[in-house]
């Protein structure tokens, strides 16, 4: 899985394997025939995460990264999920999103009200992709908008992992 011009792309061979189908490209490369005679039974990813978690994750993604490329939106979701999995942080999506460690909102949209904005379809897709394991930033637990924040504290104390769009990610 990778991103291309802000879109999530999955190689055809992987799709064939996942769905248990065979895809045949026409000789002139203008059409694709899919043989689903041996269709695999896939359980929806939504059976592994709840609507409430998608709700809060898509809201924070929209508020923090709604103007960023899809990889950047997914990466913000990854930071939240990485925190949920890390014993140093709260253990639910909502608790991580609204965490006020040291009396300071860990995600500014919870302090300024942007968390209440309705997420668009991209933010919801990014949340679901993050839940389903697409992860462009590895073990990142923090991110900043480098155009709106001085990175010196982050650079001196944390390990840089990636830059996507306007955000710099750290572990």
Where are these regions (language model features)?
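Primary recognition of N-terminal secretory signal peptides and signal-anchoring hydrophobic helices
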Residues: 1-58
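Bacterial extracytoplasmic/cell-wall-associated proteins, especially those involved in peptidoglycan
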Residues: 43-171
């Amino acid at each position: 899985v990778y991103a291309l011009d802000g879109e999530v792309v999955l190689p055809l061979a992987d799709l064939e394997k996942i769905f248990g189908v065979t895809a045949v490209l026409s000789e002139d490369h203008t059409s694709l025939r899919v043989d689903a005679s041996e269709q695999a039974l896939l359980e929806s990813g939504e059976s592994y995460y709840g609507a409430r978690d998608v709700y809060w994750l898509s809201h924070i993604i929209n508020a923090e990264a709604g103007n960023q490329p899809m990889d950047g939106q997914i990466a913000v979701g990854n930071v939240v999920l990485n925190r949920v999995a890390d014993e140093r942080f709260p253990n639910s999506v909502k608790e991580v999103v609204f965490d006020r460690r040291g009396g300071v909102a860990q995600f500014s949209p919870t302090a300024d009200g942007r968390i209440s904005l309705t997420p668009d379809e991209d933010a919801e897709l990014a949340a679901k992709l993050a839940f389903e394991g697409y992860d462009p930033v590895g073990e990142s637990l923090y991110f900043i908008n480098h155009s709106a924040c001085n990175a010196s504290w982050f650079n001196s104390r944390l390990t840089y992992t990636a830059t996507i769009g306007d955000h710099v990610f750290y572990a």
